[in-house]
Curated annotation (Swiss-Prot):
Changing S160A: Reduces activity by about 50%. Keywords: Acyltransferase, Disulfide bond, Glycoprotein, Metal-binding, Secreted, Signal, Transferase, Zinc. Changing D248Q: Abolishes activity. This is Glutaminyl-peptide cyclotransferase. GO terms for cellular component: extracellular exosome; extracellular region; ficolin-1-rich granule lumen; specific granule lumen; tertiary granule lumen. GO terms for molecular function: glutaminyl-peptide cyclotransferase activity; zinc ion binding. Disulfide bonds join C139-C164. Its EC number is 2.3.2.5. It comes from Homo sapiens (Human).
Length: 361
C-alpha cells in the first residue's frame, strides 16, 4: 500500500459515479455477455454448522504459517530486487508442494517507472482453470522502496507480507477440501478458486496513475482481452471473476474493516456473521464483539489499491483493508515485532470459513 493518505482516497461523488458506470465499463464485463457470468449475482453460500467451524479452527495453524509462510517474506522485496525474486520463488514453492493441483502462471512484463523500465511479475495460481467462475483472493507481494535507514530496511509486514502468508496458509489448511475442485460435477457449481499475488502495487516515488498499481493494471487489461472459457466469443477472464477479495494492510492489532461497495455488501455481511459465530463458539482469541473487525458502517470513498483496475472493468470487489490504516503504515516499524498473532489467527479462521462457504465445500 503506497502513497499519501490524501492521495489514496477518492471522494464519495467520484465513487458513486464510478459504481454507476460499472455495468457499461469498456473492455470488461458487458451487459450483452452470455448467461453464465450472471450466476455470481444470485450465488448463495453453503452455511457451515458449528461442527465444521470447529474443524476449520483446529485445522489452521498460526505457528506454522508464521514460520513457513510469513518469515521468509519479511525481507526487502521491491520490484526487480533480489528479495522480490526470493519472495516470488517462496510463494510458488509453497503452492507447488500442495496436493490440490494448483496451476501456476507468471505474468512478467516491462513497464516504464520513474527509474526507467523495470520488470514486474504477477503470480496467478488457479484451481481448475477450466471452471467458468472463480472466487479470487488477492494481495500484493512487493514492498515499497525506501532507502536504508540506520541499517534497517522496509519489510512491509502488514503491507503486504501478512496477507500473502494468510493466502498461503489458507491453501495449506484447506488443501484436502480444495482437492475436490479439480473436477466439475453436476452436484456443484462450475466454480473454483484463484489466488493472485500482484507485483508493483507500490509507487517508486509519488503515488500517481502512472506510478502505482503496475501489476494489477497490466493483469486486468490482459484478462479483459483473454477469452474465457478458451475460444469463447464475448466473454473474457474478467467475466469469470465472481468476486475479487483483496487483502491489504493486515496484521496490526484491533483492525476495523468497513464495507466499501454496495454490490458486495451481502458478502461483507457474511464475514460479519462468520466472525460472530466463531466468537460465540469461543474459537477466536482475545476477541470481543465490541471490538469486532467487520463494522456496521460504509466507507465514504474508495481507497486506491490493486482492485481499482478490476473495479473499473465491472468486477465485484470485497476490499479487506482496515480503516484507519495501521499506525506503522509506511514506516520502518511495519515489521514482525509489531504484528498481532491473535488478530492474524482470527482473520485466518474467518477467511477460511468464508472461502469454504462460498465454494460449497
Amino acid at each position: 500500500m503506497a502513497g499519501g493518505r490524501h492521495r489514496r482516497v477518492v471522494g464519495t461523488l467520484h465513487l458513486l459515479l464510478l459504481v454507476a458506470a460499472l455495468p457499461w465499463a469498456s473492455r470488461g464485463v458487458s451487459p450483452s455477455a452470455s448467461a453464465w457470468p450472471e450466476e455470481k449475482n444470485y450465488h448463495q453460500p453453503a452455511i457451515l454448522n458449528s461442527s465444521a467451524l470447529r474443524q476449520i479452527a483446529e485445522g489452521t495453524s498460526i505457528s506454522e504459517m508464521w514460520q513457513n509462510d510469513l518469515q521468509p517474506l519479511l525481507i526487502e522485496r521491491y520490484p526487480g530486487s533480489p528479495g522480490s525474486y526470493a519472495a516470488r520463488q517462496h510463494i510458488m514453492q509453497r503452492i507447488q508442494r500442495l496436493q490440490a493441483d494448483w496451476v501456476l502462471e507468471i505474468d512478467t512484463f516491462l513497464s516504464q517507472t520513474p527509474y526507467g523500465y523495470r520488470s514486474f511479475s504477477n503470480i496467478i495460481s488457479t484451481l481448475n482453470p477450466t471452471a467458468k467462475r472463480h472466487l479470487v483472493l488477492a494481495c500484493h507481494y512487493d514492498s515499497k522502496y525506501f532507502s536504508h535507514w540506520n541499517n534497517r530496511v522496509f519489510v512491509g509486514a502488514t503491507d503486504s507480507a501478512v496477507p500473502c502468508a494468510m493466502m498461503l496458509e489458507l491453501a495449506r489448511a484447506l488443501d484436502k477440501k480444495l482437492l475436490s475442485l479439480k473436477t466439475v460435477s453436476d452436484s456443484k457449481p462450475d466454480l473454483s478458486l484463484q489466488l493472485i499475488f500482484f507485483d508493483g502495487e507500490e509507487a517508486f516515488l509519488h503515488w500517481s496513475p502512472q506510478d502505482s498499481l503496475y501489476g494489477s493494471r497490466h493483469l486486468a487489461a490482459k484478462m479483459a482481452s483473454t477469452p474465457h472459457p478458451p475460444g469463447a466469443r464475448g466473454t473474457s477472464q474478467l467475466h469469470g471473476m465472481d468476486l475479487l477479495v483483496l487483502l491489504d494492510l493486515i496484521g496490526a492489532p484491533n483492525p476495523t474493516f468497513p464495507n466499501f461497495f454496495p454490490n458486495s455488501a451481502r458478502w461483507f455481511e457474511r464475514l460479519q456473521a462468520i466472525e460472530h459465530e466463531l466468537h460465540e463458539l469461543g474459537l477466536l482469541k482475545d476477541h470481543s464483539l465490541e471490538g469486532r473487525y467487520f463494522q456496521n458502517y460504509s466507507y465514504g470513498g474508495v481507497i486506491q489499491d490493486d482492485h481499482i483496475p478490476f473495479l473499473r472493468r465491472g468486477v465485484p470487489v470485497l476490499h479487506l483493508i482496515p480503516s484507519p490504516f495501521p499506525e506503522v503504515w509506511h514506516t520502518m516499524d511495519d515489521n514482525e515485532e509489531n504484528l498481532d498473532e491473535s488478530t492474524i489467527d482470527n482473520l485466518n479462521k474467518i477467511l477460511q470459513v468464508f472461502v469454504l462457504e462460498y465454494l460449497h465445500l
